[in-house]
A protein has these predicted regions:
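Short, solvent-exposed secondary-structure boundary/capping segments
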Residues: 29, 108-113
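Structural motif
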Residues: 69-72, 86
Length: 142
């Protein structure tokens, strides 16, 4: 995980939001109307002072679900209370990692999406904290 500074609210800039669902086939010319405008601040950032960007490294979260690819930009909110099922940035024994959080009566685990990587059970005596909850993933195709 590469770290970036806290989010500064971007200048408000609205982009056209097309109301039609985009099929992964041939587009329909009848669906060329706008639903409204979209502000990326409103979409991605709920609490600017507690929001950071981090860049993912590795492929432990590249699996069956919507995945996190190597190089993806993650939006992380440190003010959110983590819960089971959330993708989190965790610090375990001084090392940061991005994993899915699983909490049960038997313990706490950090779960990779990629089955080639082991589940990490948090053991007594380990230095562990949740640094923030991942709220969005930004991937670039080029």
């Amino acid at each position: 995980v590469d770290y970036y500074t806290p989010v500064q609210r971007l200048l408000a800039r609205r982009f056209p939001l097309v109301s039609a669902r985009i099929e992964a086939g041939f587009p329909s010319p009848a669906d060329d109307h706008l639903e409204g405008e979209l502000d990326l601040n409103e979409l991605l950032i709920q609490n600017a002072p507690a929001t950071f960007f981090v860049r993912a490294r590795g492929d432990s979260m590249n699996g069956e679900r919507p995945t996190i690819q190597d190089g993806d930009l993650l939006v992380v909110d440190k003010s959110r209370t983590p819960k089971t099922g959330d993708v989190v940035i965790a610090c375990l024994d001084g090392a940061f990692t991005v994993k899915r959080l699983r909490c049960t009566a038997e313990g706490v685990w950090l779960m990779p999406e990629n089955k080639a990587f082991p589940e990490i059970r948090i053991e007594a005596g380990q230095e562990f904290c949740i640094w923030g909850v991942v709220t969005a993933r930004i991937s670039q195709f080029h």
